[in-house]
């Protein structure tokens, strides 16, 4: 596991983590590991961890860190991650961040954290105007004027949790649980903050400059 390098893409909901993670994965030819996709895959395949996670989700409870970390660790140990990967949506709590840092230290793997900074006003505007392809999960903005995914020809839909009420709750949860990670990674010297209210192309150029520095 020597010579690995991982990039953790962080930011509030609607900051563009998924979009920028996918672009960075393509650019660096590294796998893109989305915690959301890990959850969906584990639950859909009824894996042991997926079954346990579903039990909590179905009761409206938070999935314990031990189960979440089990899924992530399993993914990180896959052969395709032997040269590193782009991590999107994890960690979400300080305890998860400590588990991940310990894993990297024990694996002699290097990692960097990129924080996408976006104001709450911009986040609300973005999320309230976005649509997704139910097949490939690509995100589109209503200003693009598309009704179907150009790649999959599937009708674009709005995520059921992209309502103003849910958006505010997600932002509150982020501020409480995930924002403290910024200080943690800053103290470790792992963090780079990227202003991310510009166009996706401009933000990606900033990310490229960051990883080349």
Curated annotation (Swiss-Prot):
Assigned keywords, A-Z: ATP-binding, Cytoplasm, Kinase, Metal-binding, Nucleotide biosynthesis, Nucleotide-binding, Transferase, Zinc
Reactions the enzyme catalyzes: AMP + ATP = 2 ADP
Recorded hits in PROSITE patterns, A to Z, give: ADENYLATE_KINASE
Q: Region (NMP) spans which residues? A: 34-63
Q: Which residues bind AMP?
A: 35, 40, 61-63, 89-92, 96, 159, 170
**Highest taxon of the lineage:** Bacteria
Q: What is its EC number?
A: 2.7.4.3
- Entries under Pfam families matching the protein: ADK
Where Zn(2+) binds, per the record, is at 133, 136, 149, 152
One cellular-component annotation, GO: cytoplasm
Q: Which GO terms describe its biological process?
A: AMP salvage
- Which residues are ATP-binding? 14-19, 130, 139-140, 198
Q: Where in the cell is it found?
A: Cytoplasm
Identify the metabolic or biological route this protein is part of.
Answer: Purine metabolism; AMP biosynthesis via salvage pathway; AMP from ADP: step 1/1
Q: Which GO terms describe its molecular function?
A: adenylate kinase activity; ATP binding; metal ion binding
Leader sequence range is none
Region described as LID: spans on this chain: 129-162
Report the protein's function: Catalyzes the reversible transfer of the terminal phosphate group between ATP and AMP. Plays an important role in cellular energy homeostasis and in adenine nucleotide metabolism.
The entry sums up its family as follows:
Belongs to the adenylate kinase family.
- Describe its partners and assembly state: Monomer.
Q: What is known of its domains?
A: Consists of three domains, a large central CORE domain and two small peripheral domains, NMPbind and LID, which undergo movements during catalysis. The LID domain closes over the site of phosphoryl transfer upon ATP binding. Assembling and dissambling the active center during each catalytic cycle provides an effective means to prevent ATP hydrolysis. Some bacteria have evolved a zinc-coordinating structure that stabilizes the LID domain.
Identification of the protein by name: Adenylate kinase
Organism annotation: Chlamydia abortus (strain DSM 27085 / S26/3) (Chlamydophila abortus)
